[in-house]
A protein has these predicted regions:
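Short pre-active-site segment immediately N-terminal to the catalytic Zn-binding motif
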Residues: 90-109, 142-146
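Extracytoplasmic/secreted envelope proteins and their assembly/folding machinery
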Residues: 20, 24-31, 35, 47, ...
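Active-site recognition of the HExxH zinc-binding catalytic motif
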Residues: 34, 81, 108-121, 153, ...
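Post-HExxH zinc-binding segment in Zn-dependent metallohydrolases
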Residues: 136-165
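Surface-exposed patches in mature extracellular/periplasmic domains of secreted proteins
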Residues: 37-52, 126-129, 163-176
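A metal-dependent hydrolase signature that marks the N-terminal structural subdomain at the beginning
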Residues: 1-67, 72, 206-224
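Post-HEXXH active-site segment of zinc metalloproteases
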Residues: 120-145
Length: 224
């Protein structure tokens, strides 16, 4: 991926307006970065919609609450960002390093959900949806889910790595990015263990090329 000179918004997610400014900035950057790559892969690029929610939100993909993560809905090409989480992460902790972590968390989460949009545009998500529910065991279904989610994170960090100089991701931002990619939680075992998530996120950052993110060709040990 070629860098597109993406810079972090000057707004902070202290409020609805601040979070919205960040989401708008990120989706514009991601559209610019991914459009040519989707076209080269034979997909039809289309910009996603972005909605933010607090409390509960209904979508064509079901009802979700702000006690859970943001999500992407393939039916309407929409990224749903958890406003309660993003604003709360920034406002609830006074330490400067925690505020940097909150900014990096929002960046990574947004780019991850956009990664699902990329998967949808190039046909990966529809293929996954067909295959997963034909698996003989629930364990295999979960493995397919981890392959999908780990690839979305790898795609996320292709973008972040490509734009690390302009954004910029340096100093405390780099420290917090490294921390968060290796300290994920996966209670349902459908997103990948922390060390595995770090492995794929780092591959995306280093390679900055989707060919490094083929989780569906990886051995089972690489998608635990």
């Amino acid at each position: 991926m070629k860098p597109v000179g993406c810079k972090e918004s000057r707004s902070r997610q202290t409020s609805v307006a601040g979070a919205r400014a960040n989401y708008r900035n990120l989706v514009a950057c991601l559209n610019k970065a991914w459009a040519p790559m989707v076209a080269r892969a034979g997909g039809r690029f289309r910009a996603p919609s972005v909605l933010m929610f607090s409390g509960t939100v209904s979508s064509p993909c079901g009802t979700h609450s702000d006690s859970g993560p943001p999500f992407y809905c393939t039916t309407n090409d929409t990224i749903y960002m958890n406003l309660t989480q993003d604003v709360g992460n920034y406002n609830n902790y006074p330490e400067a390093y925690n505020k940097v972590w909150a900014r990096m968390w929002m960046l990574h989460q947004f780019a991850h959900e956009y990664g699902h949009h990329v998967q949808n545009m190039v046909g990966i998500f529809p293929a996954y949806a067909r295959i997963r529910y034909e698996r003989a065991t629930y364990a295999k279904e979960l493995e397919d889910s981890r392959r999908l989610e780990l690839q979305a994170s790898c795609f996320s960090d292709i973008f972040i790595g490509s734009n690390r100089r302009s954004y910029p991701i340096t100093g405390q931002s780099l420290f917090q990015w490294r921390f968060l990619i290796g300290n994920t939680i996966d209670p349902q075992h459908d997103h990948g263990a922390p060390a595995i998530h770090k492995y794929w996120a780092q591959r995306g950052w280093d390679a900055r090329n989707p060919t490094a993110c083929n989780t569906f060709a990886a051995s089972s040990s690489k998608v635990q």
